[in-house]
Amino acid sequence: MGSSKFKRAIGAVKDQTSVGLAKVNGRSASLSELDVAIVKATRHEEFPAEEKYIREILSLTSYSRSYINACVSTLSRRLNKTKCWTVALKTLILIQRLLGEGDQAYEQEIFFATRRGTRLLNMSDFRDVSRSNSWDYSAFVRTYALYLDERLDFRMQARHGKRGVYCVGGEADEEEQDQAAADLSTAIVVRSQPIAEMKTEQIFIRIQHLQQLLDRFLACRPTGNARNNRVVIVALYPIVKESFQIYYDVTEIMGILIERFMELDIPDSIKVYDIFCRVSKQFEELDQFYSWCKNMGIARSSEYPEIEKITQKKLDLMDEFIRDKSALEHTKQSKSVKSEADEDDDEARTEEVNEEQEDMNAIKALPEPPPKEEDDVKPEEEAKEEVIIEKKQEEMGDLLDLGNTNGGEAGQAGDSLALALFDGPYASGSGSESGPGWEAFKDDSADWETALVQTATNLSGQKSELGGGFDMLLLNGMYQHGAVNAAVKTSTAYGASGSASSMAFGSAGRPAATMLALPAPSTANGNAGNINSPVPMDPFAASLEVAPPAYVQMNDMEKKQRMLMEEQMMWDQYSRDGRQGHMNLRQNQNQPYSYTPQY
């Protein structure tokens, strides 16, 4: 308690000294009164400044621009020298009152004084070291100065058109133009432009600055011991009233952005989404700040606006809409790219076609037709070429006689081949014993069934067949088997060779027959040598005169050689062991062959 009382006494002494120096500074009486009023309005006492001193300062600076400059210089020196948070905060409260209720020249003077490096609203390094519990107060002083600086910058930039032609709360701004005399005699009133008539880019700029200003206001929420200090509460009252208008401006801009959201491009839609996300967090903090202010009795509860919070559901809907729109835009771009590529291909094709098309004027006329003599010579040459080609084609041999187009000869060959299969003399005459020849069925008969029966009854010489499919032709062939064997034995070229017990032909050194069991080829009379021979004419006799292919002869020779080797082995076994009954014969049969053909 002693230290605090001592510090208060020292502060009171400093205030009295400052008042005395202000009275004897040698300047005019009005300037001396201004300095004394500023010192009394910013005393070291932890009580709000008296209203009469603030009104005196406002009245003294309303006459001339020079008084405004002197007031700003005095306030700057006061902030630069003091290390007490009470003096600094009271000075900032006075500046806020002068900016809000004083002349418009205060804004310009304080703005340029701060930008020139004068310590007026730049309190970022301020710290009260006189007390141990002054940290919360020092922090509030720094944040309060930042809010005032941001507010002043916002208004100045709005007035000079660097942030658009608008102002907070729709107030009428006056643009001052300094003349040669540098007085306040000239002023132009610039009316604010309605937000609904602004362009989207201007709306984005405005709401970004409003959000920055709202962040500065939210940072002014006191903490610790500063929450219950009277000077701090008095300093909060004017800025809380200003925050109401900031909130209304932000909500108005949000409504306009929602109306334009469906028509915006994807980049602008993303900006709107980011703005809404930031505003959502700011409104939550603002609601909490207003609740504390209501509890502390700062302004009336009816003056506070109802905070319309932005729910997460609304943000999700906006995000989903942006995603769908971007996906649709992407598909359109891909289709447009494909269509452009197709158009380029079509243009290239048309260019190629145009290049390929010949100019009709560049086409030359055909020459005159040649004389008729040349036309007559050409057909003769073509006829000669055709004759030569036909001769070359006829020179090729047709072994199977398939190229013969004579229908009569082909039919006779087929009939002779079919009749050769029957056993009996071939009769060429129509009145032979074999009956009438085959006749084609006539289609012009009206009653085809009757004609078919009559034709069947006229067939003569039909041979009956025995039951079970036994053919008489087979029976006659069995009776003639002996005659065929006799003819084969008597044949010199096709006789058999080898011993009587041999199973292979040609084993006795004589050549084997080309066809083993066929009779000798017939003569011109139809039989082999003897006309009265019972052996009929062989229809395949002509093929006996042609030697078989080489691979057929090789295969036949291998078979004969293998059979000869088997026969020799059996005879050797028989001569060595003799007859030993069935067992020995069975062993001989089970003995594997010692000869293996090699190909």
Swiss-Prot record:
Q: What are the residue boundaries of the ENTH domain, all occurrences included? A: 26-162
Annotated GO molecular function terms are: 1-phosphatidylinositol binding; clathrin binding
Identify the domain of life.
Eukaryota
GO-annotated cellular components: clathrin-coated pit; clathrin-coated vesicle; Golgi apparatus; pollen tube; pollen tube tip
Matches recorded under Pfam families: ANTH (PF07651)
Q: Which InterPro entries match?
A: ANTH_dom, ANTH_dom_sf, ANTH_N_plant, AP180-like, ENTH, ENTH_VHS
| CDD domains for the chain | ANTH_N_AP180_plant (cd16987)
Q: Would the keyword Membrane be found if you checked this record's keyword annotation?
A: yes
Q: Where is the composition biased (Polar residues)?
A: 585-599
UniProt biased composition (Acidic residues): 341-359, 373-382
Region (Disordered) residue ranges read: 332-382, 580-599
- Gene3D superfamilies per UniProt: 1.25.40.90, ANTH domain
Q: Where in the cell is it found?
A: Membrane, Clathrin-coated pit; Golgi apparatus; Cytoplasmic vesicle, Clathrin-coated vesicle
Can the keyword rRNA processing be found in this entry's annotation? no
Q: Which UniProt keywords apply?
A: Coated pit, Cytoplasmic vesicle, Endocytosis, Golgi apparatus, Membrane
What the entry lists under PROSITE patterns is as follows:
ENTH
Which GO BP annotation is one of this protein's? Answer: clathrin coat assembly
- This chain belongs to the protein called Putative clathrin assembly protein At1g03050
